[in-house]
């Protein structure tokens, strides 16, 4: 254990967060996301909710200030989003500073970004459209 680092952050996740450079992206996915077929490094965080992990990492993680740092998947036509999912994520991310806007992109564009991500963290999140991409910024 380390002081001031949440016990929700595994050693593997801490290492990945430290190795990421500015502009690198990481996905925190729901339990249904096809992470293992996407290609990048996959970290398991079974049983944890995305919002809890976001709240744990945000004190350690600088969001990009030059490009939209938060991206979520848009609902497929005919499907509906649960607005409480985004609200919960925004609340978790605003623990350190005001939360930037979250951009929504279509499912296949999100999958393309996921294939190029530095890592994907699979959580136990069950919320539909519960995946979020974070783009790392420059630490001041």
UniProtKB/Swiss-Prot annotation:
Pathway per the UniProt entry: Carbohydrate metabolism; L-fucose metabolism
E.C. designation(s): 5.1.3.29
Molecular function terms from GO: fucose binding; L-fucose mutarotase activity
Active-site annotation: 22 (proton donor)
Known role: Involved in the anomeric conversion of L-fucose.
Positions that bind substrate: 30, 107, 129-131
Gene: fucU
One of the protein's GO biological processes: fucosylation
Protein name per UniProt: L-fucose mutarotase
GO cellular component: cytoplasm
Location in or out of the cell: Cytoplasm
């Amino acid at each position: 254990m380390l002081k001031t680092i949440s016990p929700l952050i595994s050693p593997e996740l801490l290492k990945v967060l430290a190795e990421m450079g500015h502009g690198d992206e990481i996905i925190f996915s729901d339990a249904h996301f096809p992470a293992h077929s996407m290609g990048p490094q996959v970290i398991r965080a079974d049983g944890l909710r995305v919002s809890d992990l976001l709240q744990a990492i945000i004190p350690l993680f600088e969001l990009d200030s030059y490009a939209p740092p938060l991206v979520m998947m848009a609902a497929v036509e005919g499907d509906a989003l649960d607005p409480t999912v985004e609200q919960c994520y925004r609340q978790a991310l605003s623990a350190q500073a005001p939360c930037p806007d979250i951009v929504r992109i279509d499912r296949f564009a999100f999958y393309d970004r996921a294939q190029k991500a530095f890592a994907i963290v699979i959580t136990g999140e069950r919320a539909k459209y519960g995946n979020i991409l974070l783009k790392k910024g420059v630490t001041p």
